[in-house]
Amino acid sequence: MTGDAVGRIVRVTGSVVDVEFSRNNLPGVFNALKTRVNRSGKEIEITLEVAQHLGDDLVRTVAMQSTDGLIRGQEVLDTGGHITVPVGDATKGRVFNVVGEVLNSNGEDIKFDEYWSIHRKPPEFSLLESKTQLFETGIKVIDLLTPYVQGGKIGLFGGAGVGKTVLIQEMIQRVAQDHGGVSVFAGVGERTREGNDLIREMQDAGVFDKTALVFGQMDEPPGTRLRVALSALTMAEYFRDVQKQDVLLFIDNIFRFTQAGSEVSTLLGRIPSAVGYQPNLADEMGVLQERITSTRGHSITSLQAIYVPADDYTDPAPATTFAHLDATTELSREIASKGLYPAVDPLASTSRILDPKYIGKDHYRVAVTVKQILQRDKELREIIAILGIDELSEEDRVTVARARRIEQFLSQNTYMAKKFTGVDGSTVPLQETIDGFDAICRGDCDHIPEQAFFNVGGLEDVERKWSKLQKELG
């Protein structure tokens, strides 16, 4: 069927709109329909996406903008295709909504050469890249214990207020500084204030012009929040497939994507599944995640913030996401409460490339030793709480002292936290990270007090801080 068929609205239920077409002109599922509404003297275009065919020449659609002002009998135009978004170099330094409209045009008439549908198939198997390569971030706790994969999918898990968005912003800054390339950011159902902060920080850091941003924020309809990640992913796919660039895709927050799917599912009348989630949760997640991949020589590396409701990792939303990830960075409220940032839980975080064949024997040996010391310290904490540290054996006392140094050394001064701490951010090369933790595990740093390890970069920073502390103590 070609576009330009005209239908009429017969029902409006929140953000779900039923539209009647003549029998020979029914639009296909995922087709974009357009209608206009007058609000405060201003004509606004509303996009509807077909979700279901109800029979009797009716289609059920999901609105991408507020449905305020829509009335029964109003005309709706079938565009004959899916929602499309602009792609290419002109998208850099621009902020878009879900349907590809520029939000920071400042009155300019911006032209784009090419538009792509947001509903695309994942790359064919023959085009996929099988090589596994470590993606160095310069953040010690990540590079050592939960190494990221170039072209992989990385999840930042955590409850409210433990630092997911700050870590995403930190990674955007580091990638632009150290790796070059293009970044695409999808703001899915998060706070508008965070979007404003992110844009200002990126402008201050000089990375805004290398990034395309797509926002569907908390105050927007569920249809917008469900599709905005696909809009951003489409822009990232263009940079990978046409311009042959390595791309970083940041999604904040995947839980809001799932939540939006649940809202849309309920509005469409589907029977809910476990804990009230949509019955097609795994399918919706798969459609998004399967497109985030590496093709021959070029990659999309995605960093996804994932809110964990009530810190419950068995909730279907985070549990469904786990299956797709190459590395998980779990942020801990307990570690954040100690003032140690990034608040990464070193024992709960995982990576599929924490294996000597991918990262080398030295890196693997040091990572395992660090985890063993931290695990032993965790087991001894209950004994220490009841009997005190003096009741431990000499060997266990040494283990606890080294674990505390390791815990402090896993914290790091980040670029994004400078405005809070006044301390410049640091990027620590991987080999320096491995050597530093190896020295602590061997006992080479047993003479240095643990406060010298707090919020520093490499071992050189520790020694400088220790010298400063000695001078202060006289």
UniProtKB/Swiss-Prot annotation:
Its main location: membrane. InterPro entries: AAA+_ATPase (IPR003593), ATP-synt_VA_C (IPR055190), ATP_synth_F1_bsu (IPR005722), ATPase_a/bsu_AS (IPR020003), ATPase_alpha/beta_chains (IPR050053), ATPase_F1/V1/A1_a/bsu_N (IPR004100), ATPase_F1/V1/A1_a/bsu_N_sf (IPR036121), ATPase_F1/V1/A1_a/bsu_nucl-bd (IPR000194). It catalyses: ATP + H2O + 4 H(+)(in) = ADP + phosphate + 5 H(+)(out). The keyword Nucleotide-binding applies. Keywords: ATP synthesis, ATP-binding, Cell membrane, CF(1), Hydrogen ion transport, Ion transport, Membrane, Nucleotide-binding, Translocase, Transport. It is an enzyme of class 7 (translocase). ATP binds at G158, G159, A160, G161, V162, G163, K164, T165. Its EC number is 7.1.2.2. Produces ATP from ADP in the presence of a proton gradient across the membrane. The catalytic sites are hosted primarily by the beta subunits. NCBIfam families: atpD (TIGR01039). This is ATP synthase subunit beta. It comes from Tropheryma whipplei (strain Twist) (Whipple's bacillus).
